[in-house]
Amino acid sequence: MSKDFSRTQRVSQQLQKELAMILQREVRDSRLGMVTISDVEVSRDLAYAKVFVTFLCVGEQTPESCLAALREHEVHIRMMLGKRIRLRLTPEVRFYYDNTLVEGMRMSNLVTEVVNKDKIKQKDAGREDEE
């Protein structure tokens, strides 16, 4: 019987949970705003972790400024992660902005716009046929 989840997937899920707790409770930085961890990808040797995050930016905050602030805390976060998870080697954590939500909304808006234009054209074509 094959395994449903590989070790890297299990470690990835656990890292996501622990990082969310660390960011919520331990990291105090007003520049961050609200951070959501959307995914964690761990290398096969468990030495590196790519953490994909999204931000709820308030005021003058931009995703780039929030990401820069978060990257300043990478070493501290890795140290706290090492205390929470028992692994031979604590993965080196790198944060990346996940723009899939923004792109998905943009694509949805484009589709809605095209559908609305198509409905208007159909109504106009229907009126011309009646005349």
From Swiss-Prot:
GO cellular component: cytosol
GO biological process: maturation of SSU-rRNA
PROSITE patterns recorded: RBFA (PS01319)
InterPro entries, alphabetized: KH_dom-like_a/b, RbfA, RbfA_dom_sf, Ribosome-bd_factorA_CS
Pfam families, per database record: RBFA
Keywords from the UniProt entry: Cytoplasm, Ribosome biogenesis
Subcellular location: Cytoplasm
Molecular function terms from GO: ribosomal small subunit binding
Record Gene3D superfamilies: 3.30.300.20
Sequence similarity: Belongs to the RbfA family.
Known function: One of several proteins that assist in the late maturation steps of the functional core of the 30S ribosomal subunit. Associates with free 30S ribosomal subunits (but not with 30S subunits that are part of 70S ribosomes or polysomes). Required for efficient processing of 16S rRNA. May interact with the 5'-terminal helix region of 16S rRNA.
Subunit and partners: Monomer. Binds 30S ribosomal subunits, but not 50S ribosomal subunits or 70S ribosomes.
Protein name: Ribosome-binding factor A
Source organism (scientific name): Vibrio vulnificus (strain YJ016)
Lineage, opening ranks: Bacteria, Pseudomonadati, Pseudomonadota, Gammaproteobacteria, Vibrionales
